[in-house]
Amino acid sequence: TLIKEWADRDIYSRIDYRKIFRPEMKTTVQELKRRGYTVALVSSTGPKLISRIVEEVGMRPEFDLIVSGKQFKQSKPNPEIYHYTADTLGIREDECFVVEDSTVGIEAAYRAGMSIAGLKDDRFGFDQSKADYHIDSISDILKYL
């Protein structure tokens, strides 16, 4: 609805994503690319907000594919978003390594048959028990790949 769209726009327009951006994200993604990995950004967030964020933090060129959950009928924990991403990139699900922090994101990747690193985030008390690995920082994934 128009009211919800306006409320969402107002909330997110006030956030300076450069201030909350994880600084190791860019160097980690660049290292993954240097090692020959394909890197996708898969988010439940809407495409306009994803676009704004990756532009603000200067990461758009780093991703081979950017996927929004708004492209699908069902959101996470439905694994469709991850199946679509793997298929689009021509990669088998069991060859994918996903970094997730939320319970529903981890469940979606688990149901898609992907390896999962649960990124620690103490703010929300997410259940990360289905993650294969537990990491404190994005850069920790480099130890596993």
Feature map (PLM): residue ranges:
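Short, basic/glycine-rich phosphate-binding loops at helix/coil junctions
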Residues: 2-11, 63-64
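Short, acidic loop-to-helix structural element flanking the phosphoryl-transfer center
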Residues: 13-41, 47, 51
